[in-house]
Amino acid sequence: MKNFELSPLFTDVSHGPPTCSSYWLVTQDRIRIRVALWRSEIQKGTVFICPGYSEYIEKYGKTAELLLEHGYTSVSLDWRGHGLADRLTPNPLLGHVETFSDYLKDFDAVIDWAQHLKLPKPWFVLGHSMGGAILLRHLQKNKHFKAVAFSCPMWGIKLSPPLRIFAYIYGSLARVFKFDKNFAPTRSEKGYFDESFEKNALTNDPDMWSYLIEQTTKHPSLKVGGPSTRWVTSCLLYTSDAADDSIRV
């Protein structure tokens, strides 16, 4: 059986089941990502968790605990450029990807790993925010899962028609003149977790907010700031027909 290299996991802030182990995986384009596994002895099935933008494995420790209580093994990952996975630019706080479809290579690596380990079936999957956008495209060509759930899926970015046109033009110019790896306009190293609870855009739950702040304060290597211009342009193109894609799944 193939051996997978163990990776760090910050159990002091994940508050997940003690049965967790985490590993490094290498994608087909040689990007190193991180995957975590919380095993259940009951083996009712496996739930895959696809995180959103700026998220990381540790955020889903409590979710894994809840799933384990119901007899389910669970899996989550750090997408490229997120958590402890390889960052793609010299500035680790820049949220960047060359093309949005590259995230599919990350999920393919996780599926191959899960198949190798023969994780208990049936398989289920949850896609949150950006993870929902990635998952939607994966489901068009793959039938690994018995059931799928989406949480606030990022199936588009709400922009007025003039602003959308500007974004495409700006993104094209940025690529030609090679500043597409800079922060997108109005964005910076400041991320979701740099706001106060009152101004945050993630949650109305003060306990959850404290949970997230503890994680990124104790382990700042998990943090990601704003996205690059390349990320935004690629996201707009990738999600432009998401509504039609959902019908075809």
Residue positions per predicted region:
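Glycine-rich nucleophile elbow surrounding the catalytic serine of serine-hydrolase chemistry
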Residues: G127-R137
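Alpha/beta-hydrolase-fold enzymes
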Residues: L136-K223
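Alpha/beta-hydrolase active-site loop
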Residues: H96-W113
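An N-terminal hydrophobic leader/cap segment in hydrolases
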Residues: M1-V26, R34-L37
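Active-site glycine-rich loops that stabilize anionic/oxyanionic intermediates
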Residues: G52-E55
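Conserved alpha/beta-hydrolase
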Residues: L68-L88
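Conserved small/polar residues in nucleotide/adenosyl-binding loops
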Residues: Y238-A243
